Design a protein with these regions (language model features):
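Conserved acidic segment of CheY-like receiver
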Residues: 2-14, 18-22
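Active-site residues of response regulator receiver
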Residues: 9, 55, 83
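Short hydrophobic/Thr-rich beta-strand motif most characteristic of the beta2 strand and flanking loop
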Residues: 27-35, 43
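Acidic catalytic/metal-coordinating carboxylates
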Residues: 36-39, 62-65
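Active-site beta3 strand of CheY-like receiver
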Residues: 47-53
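Active-site T/S-Asp motif of two-component receiver
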Residues: 54-55, 66
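Receiver (REC) domain active-site loop signature in two-component systems and cognate sites
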Residues: 58
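Short, flexible helix-to-coil linker/hinge segments that flank and couple to helix-turn-helix
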Residues: 89-96, 101, 106-152, 157, ...
């Protein structure tokens, strides 16, 4: 059974490149493309894909608003933010909006495919370049204080510390 994808980006070259790349991955099928958040919500309502790759900054409706709508209407649909924004506050906002992943457009194509596979396996995926900042933000939040709680299992915590180690080694 293939993973059904909707690709959402307001830049035609990016959207078409992603769709073309994913269409060559054996277990993945691009079932729709959207140019903004409103189109993405409509496509998800019609097609019920497994995963939506979502740009965040788009006209008409931004990716964060679209993510909230998609996740509230269709909890089984996984949204992966794919953006240029590495700012910690935007990453946190996307995760709190319901994104199952946050990947940077500077990522290698194989990393984006791995991210889609990870969210399909029930995991949360975050680009290594921003993982440390996300863990720092959520570890500083009081437990049970809000409606959204992030469950970091020991494996996920060890993954985060591996990213920390990799970042430190790269920064040296």
């Amino acid at each position: 059974m293939s993973v059904r994808l909707v690709v959402t980006d307001d830049h035609p070259i990016m959207r078409q490149a992603l769709a073309g790349y994913f269409s060559r991955v054996e277990e993945m099928e691009v079932v729709g493309q959207a140019t903004n958040g409103r189109e993405a919500v409509e496509l998800v309502d019609q097609l019920l894909p497994d995963v939506v790759l979502m740009d965040l900054k788009m006209p008409e409706m931004d990716g964060l608003t679209a993510t909230r709508m998609i996740v509230s209407r269709h909890p089984s649909v996984r949204v992966v933010a794919l953006t240029t924004f590495a700012r910690r506050d935007i990453v946190v906002e996307a995760i709190l909006a319901g994104a199952a992943g946050y990947l940077l457009k500077e990522s290698e194509p194989e990393a984006v495919i791995a991210g889609v596979r990870a969210v399909m396996a029930g995991q949360v995926t975050v680009s290594p370049e921003i993982a440390r900042g996300v863990v720092e933000v959520f570890s500083a939040r009081p437990c049970g204080g809000g409606s959204h709680q992030i469950d970091l299992t020991p494996v996920k915590l060890s993954d985060a510390s591996l990213y920390d180690t990799a970042d430190a080694a790269r920064d040296s």
